[in-house]
Amino acid sequence: MTNTELQIKNIVYEEFSKLISNIEGDFKTNFVKKRYNFLLSQLDETITANMVFVSSFESKSGFAIETCAKRIARLKFGDENVPTIVNPRNVKHNINPNTISGQNIVTDIDTDNGELRGNISTFRATNVAAGKGSSRSESGVTQTSIKTLLPMAQKYKASGYHTKPVDLAFFDGSDWVVLELKAGGDLDSSNAPANVEKLLTIYAGLNVPNSKAYFATLYNKNGEGNTWTGAVKKHMAFPEMFLIGKKFWNIILPDGIMYERFTELYKMALEELDLNSRINEMIRRTVK
């Protein structure tokens, strides 16, 4: 195992160790709450406890793996190119980066302005994909078309500074890249428009010409090698605006390490955590 591979395995180990400790900390409380749900009253307590774990793991693991992705991206691009405060235009601010979890963009554009948000919503809505099969036309939201949002957003510059959280942002040596990153592999159709508009607002607020925006997922819900069928495809051009599963990881993994090797390192880290034994013991203690 190379030093870089060891660093990646340790990142996964550290972040998932925090995750499991977090789940263990409030598991009993969450289990007791489920016991009051009469809809589950006929289920065995062990089944209920397993349901509680799965729900808790799915809701909390997203942050853990997103943190892993950020730390891994820093191995490839350098800490300075995956900053906590994303501020390529050097907007003046007084934010202490130590008070921020995750990443925030800093901008002099009022990203909460109603008119700006309305314009972005209109841009998305007028560029949705249409039709099916051979008659389908892809969304007009492309890396080229979104550049029209930059001069439009400059009309909403305001005094002081504004911040906007971003799932992942980095400078790859040529472009600033901002991502809406989903641990769950997709969004339902009702949430897709709002999430696309959030990403476009971040892109407009960043407001640098050498920038790109992507919708990304940690895995391909249709299976690697298969065409992804997510709801967001209606609102952004596919595949141009997407980094799905393997494609996402191969963008941020250090040179020489591919997605397949990363999944091996991930499994090694979770085996070292003795994840299954800890989960089973936690459930056993709770239902006894």
Language model region names:
Residues 73, 166-185:
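Conserved catalytic cores of phosphodiester-cleaving nucleases, focusing on short active-site segments
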Residues 79-81, 204-212, 234-246:
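Structural alpha-beta junctions
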Residues 54-56, 150-157, 182-190:
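Surface-exposed cleft-lining segments at the edges of enzyme active sites
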Residues 1-95, 285-288:
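Nuclease-adjacent, charged terminal/linker segments that flank catalytic cores
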Residues 85-173:
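Active-site metal-binding core of divalent-cation-utilizing nuclease and nuclease-like domains
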Residues 3-18, 228-288:
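Non-catalytic C-terminal interaction segments of nucleic acid-processing enzymes
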